[in-house]
Amino acid sequence: MTDTNKMIINLAVFGRTQSGKSSAGNVLLGSADFYSSFAPGSVTKECSLGRSCHLHGFMRRGGQEISLQIQVLDTPGYPHSKLSTRCVKQEVKKALLHHFGQEGLHLALLVQRADVPFFGQEASNAVQLMQELLGDSCKNYMAVLFTHAEELEEAGLSEEEYLREASDTLLTLLDSVQHRYIFLSGRGNLCNEQRIKILERIMEFIKENHFQVLSLA
């Protein structure tokens, strides 16, 4: 297979402490690259890059089958229970430039627990961090990934019903990112079927941007 038949997709996950960033990254990769555990404080203290195996024939482009590889940058939660604001910003900025400085970023995922209300300053902190590090145009390359989506099913809510009850803060954010969002269930985290559906959704977002990347240089 030639290089023209291969595509590398660069993703980064951001969000509050215990939002499920590392677990979501593992689902995207299809492997347990990132350490994830329940804890009363922040678990991830430094950025880490994970790479998936090649997904052969995942999509077609120009009449040819394309082999896809996913790269995910896991970032510390923000605000962080152990690291200062300055340390988190420096760590994430350094990692973004190191890993994606030449190739650019296809999509930045704001990870938000579906069972935690999104409003107030704490909810806005991660969004502000993303804008500060990625620039004013970052919302053109941003999507919201809701974790713990199994809570919707237990509450008898569809995704549409959930969003109708969402806070104005969340609805405004979704409007600003052209309603790019994904729901991720915690049941069977590494389930390949769920992973493929999420990757297909992500590729839809990337196609909407005509495969352009957010420049970090």
Swiss-Prot record:
InterPro entries: G_AIG1 (IPR006703), GIMA/IAN/Toc (IPR045058), P-loop_NTPase (IPR027417). GTP binds at G15, R16, T17, Q18, S19, G20, K21, S22, S23, S36, H148, A149, E150. PROSITE patterns: G_AIG1 (PS51720). The keyword DNA repair does not apply. It comes from the Eukaryota. Pfam families: AIG1 (PF04548). Residues 6-217 form the AIG1-type G domain. SUPFAM superfamilies: P-loop containing nucleoside triphosphate hydrolases. Gene3D superfamilies: P-loop containing nucleotide triphosphate hydrolases. Keywords: GTP-binding, Nucleotide-binding. GO terms for molecular function: GTP binding. Belongs to the TRAFAC class TrmE-Era-EngA-EngB-Septin-like GTPase superfamily. AIG1/Toc34/Toc159-like paraseptin GTPase family. IAN subfamily. This is GTPase IMAP family member GIMD1. It comes from Mus musculus (Mouse).
